[in-house]
Amino acid sequence: MTDNTVWHETLHDQFGQYFAVDNVLYHEKTDHQDLIIFENAAFGRVMALDGVVQTTERDEFIYHEMMTHVPLLAHGHAKHVLIIGGGDGAMLREVSRHKSIETITMVEIDAGVVSFCRQYLPNHNAGSYDDPRFTLVIDDGVNFVNQSHQTFDVIISDCTDPIGPGATLFTSSFYEGCKRCLNPGGIFVAQNGVCFLQQDEAIDSHRKLSHYFGDVSFYQAAIPTYYGGIMTFAWATDNDVLRHLSTEIIAARFHQTHLKCRYYNPAVHTAAFALPQYLQDALSPKEVS
């Protein structure tokens, strides 16, 4: 890969997207993944793993705000948060904005990703790696949730697509481990791809998660970087009230945090759980309300 070329995403065989590469900042295969970080005039710095875009400076705030503030504000009194993946540091950045959080644990399989991102994506982590509440664990996420003695109020799986090393974070073993690590009333969320193009992933996750959690559904956000439509996030908890909280309740909690967001707001929070009919039909009407 050289400067002034075009980088093509390889997630889909029959269609896809490309980025003009203005400047390659880093490109090397780590022990686990093929990682590249380059600059693009429209999206800023772009990071891709194994031919799939993971994040861009231009729109990462949408993904990370929705992955953090939705479960944290729905929970209402979370103190201990676990992030699986998230090596770019942006998920940590958003969680750390909640001053009521007491501990933030991040489990990343590849120490190299953390090092690269601290150097090349500083706006993503915005200094959050230095938060005294933060602990970094270099380990496989499945192993951690099945072996750890720690428990958490919210678990955020900032996983890659279910290919390569990221595939293990879509298995029953991982979901079962997350359930054992959650405190009563806890919430698990995970990225689940663009459901219009990756519907089988949502169906598979829904089926597996339903073995361990009483309330399983999805919520969504429109993120331009992720080609093909609206991004889907898995939602799992045993407290079915949390998914149906009113906008007024969420707004009161949001006001108490003094957060200023660029995408998330209480109305977006409640609207995000309204799923398109094709996804409801795929999951079956009896399973989604």
Swiss-Prot record:
Subcellular localization(s) per the UniProt record: Cytoplasm
PROSITE patterns: PABS_1 (PS01330), PABS_2 (PS51006)
Bilayer-spanning residue ranges: none
Pfam families the UniProt entry points to: Spermine_synt_N (PF17284), Spermine_synth (PF01564)
Reaction(s) catalysed by this chain's protein: S-adenosyl 3-(methylsulfanyl)propylamine + putrescine = S-methyl-5'-thioadenosine + spermidine + H(+)
Domain PABS, chain residue ranges per copy: 5-238
Chain positions recorded as S-methyl-5'-thioadenosine binding sites: 33, 108, 140-141, 165
EC code: 2.5.1.16
MF terms in GO: spermidine synthase activity
Binding-site residues, spermidine: 64, 88, 158-161
UniProt keyword annotations, A-Z: Cytoplasm, Polyamine biosynthesis, Spermidine biosynthesis, Transferase
Pathway participation: Amine and polyamine biosynthesis; spermidine biosynthesis; spermidine from putrescine: step 1/1
Origin superkingdom: Bacteria
Main location per the UniProt record: cytoplasm
GO cellular component: cytosol
Active site annotation, chain numbering: 158
Protein's GO biological process: spermidine biosynthetic process
Subunit structure: Homodimer or homotetramer.
Function, in words: Catalyzes the irreversible transfer of a propylamine group from the amino donor S-adenosylmethioninamine (decarboxy-AdoMet) to putrescine (1,4-diaminobutane) to yield spermidine.
Listed name of the protein: Polyamine aminopropyltransferase
The species this protein was found in: Enterobacter sp. (strain 638)
Upper taxonomic lineage: Bacteria, Pseudomonadati, Pseudomonadota, Gammaproteobacteria, Enterobacterales
